[in-house]
């Protein structure tokens, strides 16, 4: 569930029918977008912890603007081989399989193109075709090789995982909720991507 405009995932886990379920809502900001959280639980409100998990995923693995993130370090080492965490290696394996399966219609190496548009920056604009043509020579999922936890980017290639970040965040939250027996359901909506999780009642 790494990429998509809309995705719904339902997981059934037994919850006692006579237990009073509370509804908690929260609006957060992560991954450059508004995140709406609705939690149904017989326990504590976990929305703050869930929002923090999404931000942690962004800053530790995915953000190209945070120089301490693994993706930023990969981009900075373009042309060299870099060792990444098992978690990021797993994400990248799925991401590049998606790129391969789509024949490059989805391509995570468009980092330089994204920077050129500067959509979230101070000077968002539509670039000239000549500018795009110049940078397209560094685009192509084939410019990245994966060998376990070792990743090699060809010189000039730049990764941007913005298209998959929300899906990764939803997957991490889903795994976290599987460990929370008090949670009976959740709707997590980072604007362009919706994740649903429900527990079955007896």
Residue ranges and their predicted role:
Residues 3-159, 175-186:
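A contiguous, well-ordered beta/alpha segment that forms the leading edge of an enzyme domain
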Residues 113, 192-193:
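Conserved beta-strand edge residues that scaffold enzyme active sites
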Residues 162-175, 186-190:
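Loop-centered beta-sheet repeat module
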Residues 194-201:
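Conserved small/polar residues in nucleotide/adenosyl-binding loops
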